[in-house]
Amino acid sequence: MKKLGKYMNTISAKDFNASMAPYVDEGIKRANLIGNRGPVKFDSNGKLAKDILDAYHHNGFYVFEGFVSAAEIELLQTEMQDLLDRAPVDNGAKVDKYGRAAFGQEFARPVYTLIKPLSDPWGGTMALNGRHPTQMTQPLGDSTLPEKVVFAMEGMCQIMSSGLRLYGHPSLLAIASTINGEDFVPYMDAIFVKQPGVGGAVSWHQDGVTHWNSPNWDEDIHGFNFQVQLYDTSAKSCLWVLPGSHKLGKLDIKKIVSDNGSEFLADAVPLHAKAGDVTIVNRQMLHGSYVNTSSDQRVSLTIGFHRKSSVIGQRGALNEAGDAFYDEKRIDERSQVIAVAIDSRGQFYPNEPRFTYVPMQGREDTLRFNPDNWEKVVKNYNLKDLAI
């Protein structure tokens, strides 16, 4: 197989797409042998079914098929397309591609991150605590590509009404409770965007940075991320993972990629999915994604959760300032967004059973979805994310 990587950034997008074909075929075969996908199931106590939980713990991932209804996905797609249309032309710009005021300027943190098409903005840099030590191939596009494209978006709960409702989805929260305990807490959320033929790469990495040397370390100490897929994504555009790597501690990623001879890791598998599928990936899993030279539109709504015990008493990491301290007050304030999201969903889907979030039990009346709580609890909620 052709060796590609940070020293091979003169390959064309067309040739890179072709070079992936045998790797994709083999990856799909490996994924099919593992399985780890199917509809979500719960036991009589409302907990994630044991066979699914065991499969998740063994491999570090699962693909829940048909998780979000087609009607809800359509609402999410509609809002997402509007947000992409209203994106600034570059980071820090005030106008969109039509010359209108760009969306999101009222929020404390920028909503959008834009990058050069087909680039790997974090790979080989010290961004995000240096957790992306290698860089993916960045193929050359043609002259018709835009200068910048949307790569990621922050603040799903404040920029999308449907996103806030999704955050209160009872099945998502029931899974979080099963894995992280009834007092589970939020991590953060982000939207990864890989538009057809221009989407950027996310180089191989493990998400967690805080607890690698903890005396209480175990495979779940850094939590997990859901990704709700808004569109069908093939193995050429989706996330790839190295099964079982969440059990191995902090990995020498540079050595793994070097020993492999290319960024196409031999044992990795693709988490290809349909619109409405939801993937769950342990944050200690080695994972990444390649530039999107395919015709797929990939938009992944990423929602993370932790054990409370992993977060309490810790200081900021990743996108949070190092002097941020995760005390009871900060954890409680950030967790209130879950309660407001549950009520927002309940108002919109009145016939759907609501999830009972134990940390907010008894405070439901004060955490209703209304204009006051949108201003007090939801707006700029991501300033209180709990990254570890």
Predicted regions and their residues:
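A structural signal for short, well-ordered beta-strand segments
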Residues: D189-I191, F226-V228, L301-F305
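Acidic, His- and aromatic-enriched active-site or binding-groove loops in soluble protein domains
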Residues: S203-G223
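Non-heme Fe(II)/2-oxoglutarate
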Residues: K2-F42, R86, P117, D252-K254, ...
